[in-house]
Regions:
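Short coil/turn linker and secondary-structure boundary residues
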Residues: 37, 122, 217, 232-234, ...
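Long, well-ordered, tryptophan-enriched scaffold segments
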Residues: 136-138, 242-247, 379
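The feature marks either
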Residues: 204, 208, 215-220, 224-262, ...
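Short alpha-helical "patches" and their helix-cap loops
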Residues: 78-82, 233-243, 338-343, 543-545
């Protein structure tokens, strides 16, 4: 009995030790982020991260515990082979999760969840486009080496039998003792006997989010995310549904008051519309907003010539979330993406569908893979009639990691505009891709690789608009220039508010005059605002608000996997969803947006559940 109990405890605490040691490795790998931390900070991270390590170790020790019980009844070699196979699989899975998390954190700024699985299986090529061949190769080699090291440790400590375990005389007693020990794993797995079960918030201990992120066990984070993907009506339950309904009713678009009038931004109600959705752009690239000079020179020019929304925010952090925000006025979700569920996107209203009913001809242009993240099904269900994507360009023109570079994309669009008879009015959605990792572009104006890629994308947009101005279509065209999500420059940004600020600019012959709109808004508000300007109904867009309506509440709302933000003129608030605590609270009315932000997210998941 004693040997089996020792082996059981050794298995459990070996898993714990391996998880604990991953934390300083993570911090050393990202030493640029942790340059000013002390040795004591390393130990604090390891200590506070223990709850998740203990929990996951409990899950992983359950099967070895059952095998030890079985070994009290038979010494069959099958048990040894199962044991060897189990630890081999676990070593490989642990290595894959740790190395993938190590590689992705630098791009995404949060620990591994189930998101990469969706991206990879929707389009493996595009999922890998952000990184170089050598980065992938080094990652694979690192996984294999780390898996081999883990298995060697498991073999030396747990698998190799110096003296095979004998079948005990009192096997019933041994089995009962091991069964009780295995059952006791429920305690660390669940996190104790309190009402709340184990979750990521258990390891949050610092106001410095770097420390909290380092304390997270990436394997637990991935498992938790994967097992909580679809129970939307159980997620983010902050308050009684009636209270959430009451608060949400204050945050939706309102009828125009009798004493108010909506400022008309356009000189026509049926302009041709071209959306240019700019990959990863941010206000930090524009001198207009106090950002980098001499980078987005055309966007700076458009900001002066057109209608600039100066307090505008990205709804989320990835294209699949951002596109749904722009086109359907649907907020990004922290734990999933509505694009994963075609049966739900089929039921969402969209700008293209509304414009199609108004007689618009609809087209979508993208140099990359339109099947990435289920984009094609979303676009088709939104009413898009013609989709131009990477497969529509010859191989010689698909020189970028994401497919056709931006200048090729705009050349194709201009060619189609000139050669094909345009049915007016039309809507064209144009999505750029070159200003994305790995930032490799056929353009060399700036020394900084990242800034140069944005300058390239900006030049492509500028060249296209300049050519378009020379066509008869210009006079009756509205351009909507907006990034697909939060910006990729600079990185990292410690203040989450700064990371979400993006430009929204309207230009074209269809606008009345240049204007700066300083109302707080986000991508979800484009739908209601545009349709209102066109005199079209937008009641179906539950979460979208008309920015120009004085009677409507004005706020920006955004999410990432670990927080939401609600921004108004008097309160800028960010709430950490992992730690269940306020992460940032600024303005003259601190805390004013907390309950509203919670209610908004709760109602978003209510809506997601019933779709």
């Amino acid at each position: 009995m004693k040997k089996r109990i020792i082996q059981f405890l050794t298995t459990y605490f070996l898993f714990v030790l391996l998880f604990v040691l991953q934390k300083p490795i993570f911090m050393v790998y990202y030493h640029d982020l942790y340059t000013n931390v002390s040795l004591g900070d390393y130990f604090r991270v390891m200590w506070h991260g223990l709850p998740l390590d203990l929990s996951l170790a409990g899950y992983l020790t359950a099967i070895p515990g059952l095998l030890l019980i079985a070994s009290a009844w038979t010494n069959s070699s099958i048990l040894r082979r199962i044991r060897q196979g189990y630890f081999g699989v676990i070593a490989f899975i642990m290595a894959c999760i740790f190395i993938i998390d190590l590689g992705l954190y630098g791009f995404w700024g949060f620990r591994l969840d189930a998101t990469p699985v969706f991206y990879f299986f929707s389009s493996p090529k595009d999922a890998m486009a952000s990184v170089s061949f050598w980065f992938v190769l080094l990652g694979i080699l690192s996984m294999l080496i780390y898996a081999a090291i883990l298995y060697f440790i498991f073999y030396c400590v747990l698998i190799r039998e110096k003296k095979p375990l004998k079948i005990p005389y009192r096997r019933q007693n041994v089995s009962l003792a091991l069964l009780l020990l295995t059952a006791a794993l429920f305690i660390p797995i669940r996190g104790g006997f309190s009402v709340s079960t184990m979750n990521l918030s258990k390891v949050y201990f610092s106001q410095d989010q770097r420390m909290n992120h380092a304390a997270i066990n990436p394997a637990f984070s991935f498992m938790y995310s994967a097992t909580h993907q679809n129970n939307f009506d159980k997620q983010y339950r902050f308050m009684d549904p009636k209270i959430a309904d009451e608060l949400f009713a204050e945050m939706v678009d309102k009828p125009v008051a009798a004493t108010d009038s909506i400022p008309q931004l356009l000189n026509t109600q049926r302009p041709n519309i071209i959306f240019i959705i700019l990959e990863s752009f941010s206000t930090h690239l524009m001198e207009t907003f106090g950002g980098q000079p001499n980078v987005a020179v055309n966007m700076d020019k458009f900001a002066k010539e057109g209608i600039l929304f100066s307090n505008f925010y990205g709804s989320s952090f990835r294209t699949d979330r951002g596109l749904a925000s722009i086109i359907s006025g649907y907020p990004g979700q922290p734990s999933t993406s509505i694009m994963k569920y075609p049966e739900k996107t089929d039921k969402r209203p969209s700008i293209p569908r509304s414009l199609k009913n108004a007689g618009y001809n609809l087209e979508y242009y993208y140099g990359g893979d339109a099947d990435f993240t289920n984009m094609r099904s979303y676009l088709v269900s939104s009413g898009i009639e013609k989709i131009i994507s990477d497969k529509d360009f010859p191989l010689s023109e698909r020189t970028g990691k994401w497919g056709a570079q931006d200048h090729v994309l705009f050349q194709r669009l201009m060619k189609d505009l000139k050669e094909e008879k345009q049915k007016e009015p039309f809507l064209k959605l144009v999505q750029t891709s070159s200003s994305h990792e790995p930032f490799e572009v056929p353009f060399h104006r700036l020394d900084d690789k990242i800034l140069n890629s944005f300058a390239y994308a900006d030049s492509c947009v500028g060249d296209f608009v300049k050519q378009y101005q020379e066509t008869p279509l210009w006079k009756n065209t509205l351009f909507v220039l907006v990034p697909d999500h939060q910006g990729a420059y600079p990185y990292p940004i410690e203040n989450p508010l700064d990371g979400q600020t993006i430009p929204l600019i309207l230009i074209g012959g269809a606008i009345k005059q240049p204007l700066v709109v300083d109302t707080y808004a986000s991508q979800i508000d484009i739908a209601a605002t545009l349709l209102a300007q066109l005199g079209l109904p937008h009641d179906e867009f539950t979460f979208s608000k008309n920015i120009m309506n004085p009677a409507s509440p004005h706020f920006a709302y955004f999410t990432r996997p670990n927080y939401f933000g609600m921004i108004t003129a008097d309160n800028q608030l960010v709430y950490n969803l992992d730690a269940n605590t306020v992460q940032l609270d600024e303005g003259t009315a601190k805390g004013a947006n907390l309950e509203k932000g919670k209610a908004f997210l709760q109602k978003l998941y209510d809506d997601l559940a019933k779709r």
